[in-house]
Amino acid sequence: MKLREARTGVAVRVKDGLWRSEFGGMRGTVEHRWGHPDHPALDVRLEDGRSELFWFHELDKVQEKARTA
């Protein structure tokens, strides 16, 4: 995830290979942004309902698929 993408409401996926491997691959939504503007920590509401704190570089932005009616 790029720094400019780290904002509330963005859909994210936790990167694989982190020290907290149980979260690798999980998806969620950024709920809050904390800390220094150049290195924020993000509260993420995960798909299982838990809320966890991650550094912005531990996440990938999920590309939303266009919906067709």
Segments predicted by a language model, with ranges:
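Basic/aromatic-rich interaction segments and small domains that mediate binding to polyanionic partners
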Residues: 3-68
